[in-house]
């Protein structure tokens, strides 16, 4: 069963390659990751983007735990993207799990955060950046403040009945009762 979130998908599509960090915010479990990793990824693949040009880091998974370090993330992405002519897409899911790390050049100074890494990566003209996270306070206030004028917010809401019904179909009253039982 695929749940269409066309309103949000179309918003992401409209923001493509605008030079901004796309920040997908919303309450927990409202479909931010699904929108990015399933719907938007499928759109890119249908448009002919090679799968290996979609760089995806899921910071809540152990396989990507090293990329919670913003320096590791930035270095890995630069390794892949820098000096390439092709366009790449960067998806960072659960960005609130990223760490702050000491600055190796100024250990007593301000720590390096994911804002620093994203700002650095934003300078790559062949990279389009998308991030999600569950801590909506951190994302919607902190990152949008940090990137004032340099980010687009896509605020995702829980499923509407119309979205739910479009996925399950059948009798509307039965669908409504099933939804209430969830």
Locations of regions flagged by a protein language model:
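Hydrophobic anchor at the beta1->P-loop junction of P-loop NTPases
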Residues: 24
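P-loop (Walker A) phosphate-binding loop of NTP-binding proteins
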Residues: 27
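Walker A/P-loop
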Residues: 33
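Short glycine-rich substrate-engagement loop in P-loop NTPases that contacts/grips substrate
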Residues: 55-86
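Interdomain motor-coupling "hinge/lid" segment immediately C-terminal to the ATP-binding subdomain
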Residues: 140-182
């Amino acid at each position: 069963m695929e749940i269409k979130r066309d309103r949000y998908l179309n918003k992401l599509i409209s923001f493509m390659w605008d030079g901004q960090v796309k920040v997908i915010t919303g309450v927990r479990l409202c479909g931010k990751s699904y929108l990015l990793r399933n719907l938007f990824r499928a759109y890119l693949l249908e448009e002919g983007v090679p799968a290996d040009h979609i760089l995806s880091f899921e910071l809540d998974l152990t396989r990507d735990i090293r990329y919670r370090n913003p320096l590791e993330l930035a270095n890995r992405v630069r390794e892949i993207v820098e000096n390439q002519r092709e366009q790449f897409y960067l998806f960072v899911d659960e960005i609130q799990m990223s760490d702050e790390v000491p600055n190796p050049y100024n250990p007593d100074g301000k720590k390096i955060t994911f804002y620093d890494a994203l700002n650095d990566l934003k300078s790559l003209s062949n990279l389009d950046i998308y991030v999600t996270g569950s801590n909506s306070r951190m994302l919607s206030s902190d990152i949008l403040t940090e990137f004032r004028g340099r980010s687009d917010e896509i605020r995702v809401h829980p499923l509407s009945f119309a979205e739910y019904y479009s996925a399950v179909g059948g009798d509307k009253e039965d669908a409504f009762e099933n939804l209430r039982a969830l």
